[in-house]
């Protein structure tokens, strides 16, 4: 229990006070408007108040907040209160945008200090989505089970404020945040991300959710470290039996008042944890009994510490050899590659069967075709159709749009073990482009291709920059070059998941 408290205090030692006065500084709102600290915010676009963001409005808002001594809502008129007046929607968005910038400043400074010096290049590479897959290639082939858990959303807004309270001691800022949440956020729409983004500032919403998740992960990391600080002894079978009784005394018991149960943690150095959006993934070399214990650890952690109701059905356990993990636009699984080795010893020969475990990454072709169908590039069966909304654009713009989408998908799915599915996606986009151009010129596809020839669509099949570099190093007919073309390539410049993949 004492170690647990010390661990949390060390993680929260870098607290920053007195953030509230920054709300009355005009340059904070200028930063929010100009996205000065928003370069990494690539999933959402702040809309709805950009054209209303002017210096006089900010000054009136600051003066009105400065003159007001306390935040009191009018019980008679919910649309007008003594703090924000008539334009409460505009003012609330401005305060939310400014508060998002303010609370991000301490964390941004820590990120900048971490990424300086020799760690700059590594930190840049770690920001890539593809950086996780080389790690999976090295680790997943040695693991047995994978546990997928859906992180429950907070059922009450106060949970988000309490999570931020551990990091920010400024009570005034927290009171202002609490007031804004309760005054301008509908509880049901706030829980649903798609609706809440249109009402509340998406940047602040994402920050609050990440701070809540960070608090949960910090506790889980403590439990994981407690369960794996004792490494297995590298020795023979009989020596392991000797050391076994010495290991028993190190099996620790972690107890916390809110859990109501004692958590017995077994030592396992082969636990790997990944969080992707609202899903936690835990891969382990444990037996089915121990991985089931981790399943109930998740449920107890959410229920008794964070007061989040989570059913055990939201946590799934699967065996890696029989299951494909849907993760970041890939279906990842462990595949056995059998190989037969012939050994000759004097006059006797032997056949040795050897199976090697490798990570198999495939494209989820069905879901990707479904995304292309929603975007009106093909029908539900994968047959290309024209894009009528683009038919009014110039031919060069139409071709450029299709080529850009095709190259982005090829770039993102370059790590696929099988390229056949990728070629099918490129085929759909190519003939969707042809049908769109034929529709624009009021012609059939056959007549259009016969008139202009198929050479004008060569951009779909031109070499990528990487293939061009390989062609300069190796001869065109060299076997190693063909092997490189078929191999997996992971890029460390991909920091955003493709829109078509994300909506699949």
Curated annotation (Swiss-Prot):
Keywords on record: Chloroplast, mRNA processing, Plastid, RNA-binding, tRNA processing
Compartments, as annotated in UniProt: Plastid, Chloroplast
Pfam families: Intron_maturas2, MatK_N
Gene Ontology CC annotation, any one: chloroplast
MF GO annotations: RNA binding
GO BP: mRNA processing; RNA splicing; tRNA processing
Family: Belongs to the intron maturase 2 family. MatK subfamily.
Entry function: Usually encoded in the trnK tRNA gene intron. Probably assists in splicing its own and other chloroplast group II introns.
Protein name: Maturase K
Protein source organism: Gossypium turneri (Cotton)
Gene encoding the protein: matK
